[in-house]
Structures are given as structure tokens and as C-alpha cells.
Amino acid sequence: MERVYNFSAGPAVLPVPVLEKVQRELLSYNGSGMSVMELSHRSELFQNILDDAESLIRELMEIPDNYKVLFLQGGASLQFDMVPMNLANGKKAAYVNTGSWAKKAISEAKKIQGVEVEVIASSEDRNFSYIPEIPTVSSDVAYLHVTTNNTIEGTAMFDVPDSAVPVVADMSSNILSSVYDVKKFGLIYAGAQKNIGPAGLTLVIVREDLIGQVEGLPSMLDFKVQAENDSMYNTPPTFAIYVAKLVFEWIKEQGGVAGIEALNRKKAALLYDYIDQSDFFSSPVEPSARSLTNVPFVTNSAEFDKAFVKEAEANGFENLKGHRSVGGMRASLYNAFPIEGVEALIAFMEKFANARKGGEVRV
């Protein structure tokens, strides 16, 4: 079956070589006569998968030895609760509000009893079209929470602030797509379904000194319990971890995160350059804050936007509709998305624009 160009914001496109390997190994993994989905999580076969996945992500992100790598469940949304529960410890928590997902993290933190949340910077005044300047954080604050890529709004934070307190980052939509210095963070978390693998897995990278600060937490929500049990306090998402391991291997073959970032910059530049020179399409995001992985764009008409999405689908360009909260279109160009797909999209955009510059909507 011919594959389409999938611009989904998540679950998102996976590398074809990874999917092909999954297909080959689906019925019998490593000659076992069992699918990975059927392996006991306590088996040697799965333990090797888990160990390899951790070793690879440590290599790709250059994770220091004093950080734990956890493969958890519950999505990044569960980390909106686990982070303040484990790290606030009676202190104030500082948050930067750069979009819809940051707002959800802030809202969840406020629900945790005993946690005082302070929003120290926000870009909501201009519809989250930029990254705000982050003031110096007081040393009596427990942590500073940032979102490095705002999936819905299409902005990204590439320069992480130096801070006297631990920086916590939601990297769900740009982990492994740009190089970040892990040592600048106290904790990084990311849902897997954009750049890592299938939905159902959450990656958490946490500095060891931040673990175990709060006693009496529910076991499943306690980083200490999860770390002491090497991500296997309960049955982990075994198949998702297996696919993630294959994706990590694929990223390594592409030249690691630096190699992937170079390709991502090329893909994003092609699309942004076209949008900027177009008199039909435009970007709502300030150039200095533009994401490499999520590119929103609009026409000057909601009717044209609707027609574009419909015709795009008919031509093999799937999931270009913008998030329901902002409208327009959004092209998600995650690591596995091919540059040929960007070139094909631009050609389609030009054809669509030329056909409608007279002002008529043709659906």
C-alpha cells in the first residue's frame, strides 16, 4: 500500500525502516517464537530490550551518570502532576506559560495540595506567538518549569535559561529533534508519540538528587519507587519501549541528534521560506521563536483554510488541520518526516494558491 504524507502532531510518523523491522519481527522476536507483545517483562529477552533502550538514549542525549532514565506510562500529562508532587516539597514552583500545554501543566500543579505556583513569564498577551524573556528565579523556588516546544502554537525555546534552581522541561514535541545539554536540566519529560515511538510510553530523565524528596507518595507516582525498580514497578509498556529502542537505533544511524537537527532545520527552512515569500499563506509565529517540528500557517480566509485541508487530504497530505483551539493549518515535521514530503507540500500549496488568487473558493 502506498503511504501518504502524515503531518500528524501525534501519534506521528515513524521511520519506515523501523516499521519494516517491527513487521519482520512481529510474530517471532529474536527467534523466540513469541512476539515482543507476548514477552514477559521479567524475561531476559525484554530486559535486554530495556537495557539497550536506556543505553541508546543515554548515548544520543549524552545523559550524565547522575541522572536516572525512566520509561513510564500516563503520558506527559501525568508528569504535570508527578513533577510538583515529587519536586515542590513545600516550596514555590515557577512556571513559564508559552501555550496550551504549559497552561495545562500550570493548572495541574495548582491542584496539588501545598504547592504554590507562580507564573513568572507568559506570551499569552500576543497569542503565544513568541517566547517571553524569563526573569531570574529566586533560589528559594523548588524548580522552574518550561516547555521547550509548543506543539499547538508552533514556538520553540532553544536557549534554556541558566538557573539557580532545577529546570524542568516538557520536551514532548522536540525531544531528540534538537541538541540540548541535559546538564542544564533537573528533569526532562516527554510523551513518546511524536519523536520516540508509539503512544503509551513516557520518557523521564531526572537528576538523582531530586529523587526521594517527598515521602508518602502513591507508589506509582513516586520517582523514587520507579527509579528503584528500574521502570518495572509494574508491567511497563513493553512494545512501545521496543519500538523506541528501534527508533533510537535509527536516529544513531542518521548521525545522532546533531544529524537529525541539521535535517530538521533544512526541512523547516524550506517551508518557512515558502510561507514568508507567499502572498497567500502566512505564519502567525514570530521568526525568532519558530519551531522546527510544528509549523502552523493560515490563509486570509477560514473558508480557504477549510478548502485547503480538504483538498490536501484528497492529494495524500494527511492531518494538516490546525488544532481546534487555533484553527488554520499545521504541518508537523518530526524526525521521521521525509524532506520529500515538505517539497511535495510546498508544490501543492503553490498550486492551491494560484488556483484561488481570484478569490473563489473551490471545494
Swiss-Prot record:
Residues reported to bind pyridoxal 5'-phosphate: 76-77, 101, 151, 170, 193, 234-235
GO molecular function annotation: O-phospho-L-serine:2-oxoglutarate aminotransferase activity; pyridoxal phosphate binding
Keyword Ribosomal protein: no
UniProt keyword terms in alphabetical order: Amino-acid biosynthesis, Aminotransferase, Cytoplasm, Pyridoxal phosphate, Pyridoxine biosynthesis, Serine biosynthesis, Transferase
GO BP terms in the entry: L-serine biosynthetic process; pyridoxine biosynthetic process
Reactions the enzyme catalyzes: O-phospho-L-serine + 2-oxoglutarate = 3-phosphooxypyruvate + L-glutamate; 4-(phosphooxy)-L-threonine + 2-oxoglutarate = (R)-3-hydroxy-2-oxo-4-phosphooxybutanoate + L-glutamate
Name of this protein: Phosphoserine aminotransferase
Species for this entry: Listeria monocytogenes serovar 1/2a (strain ATCC BAA-679 / EGD-e)
